[in-house]
């Protein structure tokens, strides 16, 4: 494409109308229908010439020689970056639905995320995916030491993902005594130890136990530092060792209504990716698509974010995974204390209502960020 080419207002108007027609109908459109349907206030011949120029520069194409034109992946990319705005109405609907239907009291984060994906799938009409925070991003909320049988102590760690980790620790007597008369650890002693751990570890990941200065313990508790440190270290290692990227997914029935997913082989490949190869999806949820901020067929769209919205959109062949190359994936990170801990996404055809999809994802990410903080 000629690097000197730049879109005029008419080019943008015709491209936008073509894309909106195709999103609504899944059918190619000709110049006459486009001029009449969208009141472009120019003749069909002018529209035809403009569509031809857009095709020349890779933004439209003809699926068949006798048919009208449809948008290419590059056309969608330009539309997403320059010509559309997220739907405020849909965003408000998502926020209201999540606020009204999710009950955060006494439920695990995974259960809440599962319910959230069902809401997002229903509103968007696409497949909804949410990543579960991994242990290296999950912070300690509370620690409690409780006496159990045999003079042992149960250490319970509550994470701010609402998950719990626990380990049994064999502590020696907390007060001087002979082995025969050694009492079980006193509740007051365990409370003091719990408070020490909470003071130093609340708001930090499990992995930070290695940096804890046990010398700050009162002298009488010093013998227990190494045992407690080892117990916490074992918890952290156990959590990280069992960890795999995890997605909560909902809405397969929704996306199957789209004509692009009537191909059994295509949908089987996507389902296989979601069920068996989730680790391959992980980078797409935490990276920027290659064409989001660079030259597009010679047309400089650098810096044209989605009008200030912190959302990434992977369109068609921008997706590195072959089963996804006929799809669009819209994703946004949710945060805890300004650190990204997970991501929300919707997956559908490239012929996606991007205004709605971006609004759904961004509103959901904002809601989760606020709830977790």
Residues covered by each model-derived region:
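N-terminal helix-turn-helix
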Residues: 17-20, 28-84
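Contiguous, well-ordered alpha-helical segments that form the cores/surfaces of helical PPI scaffolds
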Residues: 15-20, 329-331
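Residue-level marker of regulatory loop/turn positions in helix-turn-helix DNA-binding domains and
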Residues: 7, 27, 259
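N-terminal intrinsically disordered/low-complexity leader segments
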Residues: 1-6
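Short, leucine-enriched amphipathic alpha-helices that occur as contiguous helical runs
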Residues: 7, 11-15
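Intrinsically disordered, acidic Ser/Thr/Pro-rich low-complexity regulatory segments
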Residues: 87-373
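Cationic-aromatic interfacial patches
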Residues: 24
């Amino acid at each position: 494409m000629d690097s000197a080419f730049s879109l005029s207002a008419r080019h943008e108007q015709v491209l936008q109308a073509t894309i909106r027609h195709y999103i609504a109908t899944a059918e190619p459109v000709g110049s006459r229908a486009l001029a009449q349907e969208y009141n472009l206030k120019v003749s069909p011949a002018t529209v035809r010439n403009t569509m031809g120029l857009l095709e020349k520069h890779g933004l439209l194409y003809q699926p068949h020689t006798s048919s009208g034109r449809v948008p290419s992946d590059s056309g969608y990319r330009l539309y997403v970056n320059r010509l559309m705005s997220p739907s405020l109405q849909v965003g408000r609907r998502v926020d209201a639905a999540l606020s009204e239907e999710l009950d955060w009291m006494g439920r695990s984060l995974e259960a809440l995320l599962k319910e959230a994906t069902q809401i997002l799938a229903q509103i968007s009409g696409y497949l909804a995916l949410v990543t579960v925070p991994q242990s290296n991003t999950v912070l300690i909320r509370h620690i409690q030491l409780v006496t159990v049988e045999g003079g042992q102590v149960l250490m319970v760690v509550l994470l701010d993902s609402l998950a719990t980790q626990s380990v049994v620790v064999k502590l020696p007597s907390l007060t001087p005594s002979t082995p025969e008369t050694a009492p079980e650890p006193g509740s007051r002693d365990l409370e003091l130890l719990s408070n020490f751990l909470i003071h130093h570890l609340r708001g930090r990941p499990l992995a930070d136990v290695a940096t804890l200065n046990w010398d700050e313990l009162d002298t009488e508790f010093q013998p227990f530092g190494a045992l407690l440190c080892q117990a916490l270290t074992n918890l952290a290692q156990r959590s990280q060792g069992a960890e795999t990227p995890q997605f909560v997914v909902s809405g397969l029935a929704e996306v199957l209504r789209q004509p692009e997913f009537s191909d059994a082989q295509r949908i089987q490949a996507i389902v296989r990716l979601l069920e068996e190869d989730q680790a391959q999806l992980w980078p797409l949820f935490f990276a920027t698509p290659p064409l989001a901020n660079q030259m597009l067929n010679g047309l400089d769209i650098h810096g044209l974010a989605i009008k200030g919205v912190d959302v990434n959109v992977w369109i068609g062949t921008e997706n590195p995974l072959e089963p996804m190359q006929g799809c669009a994936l819209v994703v946004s990170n949710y945060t805890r204390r300004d650190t990204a801990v997970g991501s929300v996404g919707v997956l559908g055809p490239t012929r996606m209502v991007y205004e709605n999809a971006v609004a759904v994802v961004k509103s959901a990410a904002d809601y989760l960020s606020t709830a977790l903080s």
